């Protein structure tokens, strides 16, 4: 049972949401009085409450979603709030649906989406993973952060071949290394206001770090937003090569580290937008004609289940006409299908650009 001080904060937060008439978050849409009353005094076995779930969305009324999962159990205990939000965000993934088992499919069927090198600057595929037996950011202790880092860094240092590389802990990082990682766009910063408000940045930088291979085409972020963000990327449009590298890395890491998986929701992540496959396949792409009107670009992209972001990701502008375009769907389809959807959509956008 949540304690009185927490419930008091929850009541105040709920009032604030109710009063915020211009708030368009999914939290506001689905946290009805009925759902609120049903959940406000519940507590997971690790001590997480509804407050941990909603505080970022209460503090940041301009959130798109507004909720995070403090631990794996939260997805079940607070399901009356999570399930409708998941269904709304992951369009078509109903509350009765079950996410399919992991399936990377035929990794050799992916192609170079821009063999002439005219449109696509770079290609990236990432997935998120959570380590079994550990809560998510808001509930982690400093010693758990360090313990997780030790497990992950020893696993990564055993990788071979193309994946072989170096682990750089954020704790005690020298200015030179820091600058080198910033120049490569590898270094992640302490979380933005959405993550800060969700208590995702405690004990920073303990347990946080970055691994990359010698070619700088494979990267792992440790304890940033998720326990693990596994990233494969390179210049140009060779999606096949990027995806094959990612799948071989995930398969290797999985042999040594058990990941949190939910029968219905797939792989579990801190933010419900990343559940399921957790896969985000993206390109940095220049489409000057299509992008002359961003609204039009977004509309066309939407038809192919693609999401358009600014050059530096969420909440940013396009610099020099370069957009970040990725698959929007992560749930209710396999990893193979998610990446295929992105490949088909990008091929179509390039074809349209050429025809304009």
UniProtKB/Swiss-Prot annotation:
Catalysed reactions listed for this entry: L-arginine + ATP = N(omega)-phospho-L-arginine + ADP + H(+)
Lineage top rank: taxon: Eukaryota
Record-annotated Phosphagen kinase N-terminal domain positions: 9-91
Any Pfam family the entry gives: ATP-gua_Ptrans
Tissue: Expressed in muscle (at protein level). Expressed in muscle, heart, nerve, stomach and hemocytes, with the highest expression in muscle. Very low expression in eyestalk and intestine. Not expressed in hepatopancreas, gill and skin.
An annotated GO cellular component: extracellular space
Gene3D superfamilies recorded: ATP:guanido phosphotransferase, N-terminal domain, Glutamine synthetase/guanido kinase, catalytic domain
CDD domains, sorted: arginine_kinase_like
Similarity comment: Belongs to the ATP:guanido phosphotransferase family.
Protein name according to UniProt: Arginine kinase Lit v 2
Highest classification ranks of the organism: Eukaryota, Metazoa, Ecdysozoa, Arthropoda, Crustacea
